[in-house]
Amino acid sequence: MNAQVKRLLQVASLALVSFAAVGPASAGSATGLWIDHTGRGGIEISNCGANLCGRLVWLKDEKNSKACGTQIIGNVKPVAGGKWDGGWIYDPDQGAKYSVEITPMGDKLKVMGYQGSKFLSETMIWRRASGELKRCSA
């Protein structure tokens, strides 16, 4: 193998490693800080072992601060196609838990809550928070 080919392979390997090392809050990731579909809550989604979990960390109406820190997403597992499924989401307005499928779409997050069948589901689009939010205190 000549020196140019070796050098090209080294550069290509370094580029692949660099792309793989992009942090979890990259544009195609479900982790990070998200504004929910109502615009009233900020949820921080993070890795919890091999799964995802999420907590309410910002509230537009600080009078509802008792909900601050509530875990509203849990045990969501990676599945094919970059999606996450098999966990749960808590709806504080309804006081109920549902199954959830999460699909990252750049700076948007498709969050589908369902009970039993995905045929009977509600899909919400969350958007990535553009900056730092003043976190509520739990």
Language model features by range: what are they?
Residues N2-A12:
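Bacterial N-terminal signal peptides that target proteins for export
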Residues A96-E101, D107-Q115, S121-I125:
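Surface-exposed interaction patches
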Residues V11-A21:
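Bacterial N-terminal signal peptides
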Residues A30-S99, G131:
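Central antiparallel beta-sheet cores of small beta-barrel/beta-sandwich binding domains
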Residues V22-A27:
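Sec/Tat signal peptide C-region and signal peptidase I cleavage site
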Residues V76, G106, K134-C136:
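Mature extracellular/passenger domains of Gram-negative fimbrial/pilin and adhesin proteins
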Residues S117-A138:
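Edge beta-strand at a domain terminus
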